[in-house]
Amino acid sequence: MSTLSEGPVARLLKEKLFAAFQPKHLEVECESHLHNVPKGAEKHFRVQVVSDEFEGKRVIERHRLVNTCLAKELATTVHALRIDAIPTSKWDGQKQEDSPTCRGGFGK
């Protein structure tokens, strides 16, 4: 398990995801620095969760599980969440692809 960002929101997301899914692998990365937000903001995240809990579930079902787990944060502090929820049997150690460059914000 690894966490690429260690701010308080990233730590909370990591704790909640770990408790809910007992993942074989977990990455929580704050990508707010790629967006037009104040320095130090924790609003944009990507997560990679590899868990037996996702076995036999379609992608949309896996995403719903993650969204439900983080519902409070999504309703309050987290603006955007990129989810990579992988069943343990389908994970071969791959890392998430880099996120595309932000194209929005303040009329851009």
Curated annotation (Swiss-Prot):
SUPFAM superfamilies tied to this protein: BolA-like (SSF82657)
A cellular-component GO term for this protein: mitochondrion
Any single Pfam family the record assigns to this protein: BolA
Gene3D superfamilies, alphabetized: BolA-like (3.30.300.90)
Region called Disordered, residue ranges: 89-108
Family, per entry: Belongs to the BolA/IbaG family.
Protein name from the UniProt record: Putative bolA-like protein K11H12.1
Organism, scientific name: Caenorhabditis elegans
Lineage, highest ranks first: Eukaryota, Metazoa, Ecdysozoa, Nematoda, Chromadorea
